[in-house]
Amino acid sequence: MKPQSAFEREPARRVFASELRETRYQFKDGEDEKSPTYVILPSGIRSNRIFIVGTLTEKQRQGDQNIFYRGRVVDPTGTFFIMAGSYQPEAMQQLARIEPPAFVAVVGKPNLYTTQDGNCLVSVRVESIAVVDRETRDLWVLDTARETLDRLDAFGTTDDSRKAQEEYGTQPDVYKKIVYDALSQVQL
């Protein structure tokens, strides 16, 4: 009999908004309902949890009985669309208390939704959100740049990166330019 392993959370991947926006491939790892759902990021790694930092520029409360909040978080490369509702009451309360504009750090699950006309929308289901300062945002940009470049350096050598190439036709130079542009906006 195999010993029960302790529950381990998946690492939260750092990803820029412009890369997450291009994400289209989602899959379930396993057959049961508790199996995790992953996305393959265009830079070549699977993720079911992401860590983002940016400026909360907009927040909107929606619903009457099933209240939830939508928001926009902007990083140097684009916009993340975030949501928090009754499925994560602490995250919803955290988001409700933050007044834009504010630098925020968010851990959440990437969510893909295909519209009737075939467009794919990507949002982040918030697990936690906190106000941070500009220095934290700048450090996140540096860390995210490093992790993105590491994924691109390994591109084509892992199953996930080969799947990304198949699904997206990823051109690493495009993402290297995104990293360069993001770094140019950091104040060190």
Predicted regions and their residues:
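OB/S1-fold single-stranded nucleic-acid-binding modules
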Residues: 1-42, 162-188
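Catalytic micro-motifs at enzyme active sites that drive phosphoryl/nucleotidyl and oxygen chemistry
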Residues: 40, 59-61, 92-95, 113
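Short nucleic-acid-contacting surface segments enriched for D/E, G, S/T with interspersed K/R
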Residues: 45, 88-107
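Structural detector for short beta-strands of small beta-barrel domains
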Residues: 47-65
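A general secondary-structure signal for short beta-strands and their flanking turns/coil
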Residues: 47-49, 66-68, 103, 119-121
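Short, surface-exposed secondary-structure boundary micro-motifs
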Residues: 55, 109-110
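OB-fold (S1/OB) nucleic-acid-binding surfaces
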Residues: 61-88, 132
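Extended, charge-rich, solvent-exposed interface segments
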Residues: 97-103, 109, 116-188
